[in-house]
């Protein structure tokens, strides 16, 4: 059965500006600008109100799968708003049983070098996604901190680091060495 109209709105905070150009959404906030295209999805995007502080997403005559995209677009825009106001921070911890993993940050936080993984001489190099900054934690030993405005780029960079330290040809229940995400949060603490 087709639903005639499915609608959802996203509230825009006062310190954030959202502009629409076709189905391209630009979100500008205190931490920077994020831009995302939704041209591949057949939806209507519209800013509401005199001050344009609401974004409405409409889908006409959609089946179940097409109606699900309405909430998906709203979630993406909410993540963009959260990114330009608070920013995203992922913390990663090195886990090792015997050989200590040495992590070196190169090129001012855009390249991570992983040495001595399982005692190997091979140096693993992982480049961060654009807009993601990586640093070693001063307070905690064996901890990496990834920060950025785009949640997808930050989480993808964390995934690349984790995948670089996968154990090959061994029983992974026994060989638990690697660098894993230990905490997900925001750079700026939200006021509750």
From Swiss-Prot:
One of its GO terms (molecular function) is structural constituent of ribosome. Keywords: Cytoplasm, Ribonucleoprotein, Ribosomal protein. It comes from the Eukaryota. Component of the large ribosomal subunit. PANTHER family: 60S RIBOSOMAL PROTEIN L9, 60S/50S RIBOSOMAL PROTEIN L6/L9. Gene3D superfamilies: Ribosomal protein L6, alpha-beta domain. It is found in: Cytoplasm. It holds the Pfam family Ribosomal_L6. InterPro entries: Ribosomal_uL6-like, Ribosomal_uL6-like_a/b-dom_sf, Ribosomal_uL6_a/b-dom, Ribosomal_uL6_CS2. GO terms for biological process: cytoplasmic translation. Belongs to the universal ribosomal protein uL6 family. This is Large ribosomal subunit protein uL6. Component of the large ribosomal subunit. The ribosome is a large ribonucleoprotein complex responsible for the synthesis of proteins in the cell. PROSITE patterns: RIBOSOMAL_L6_2.
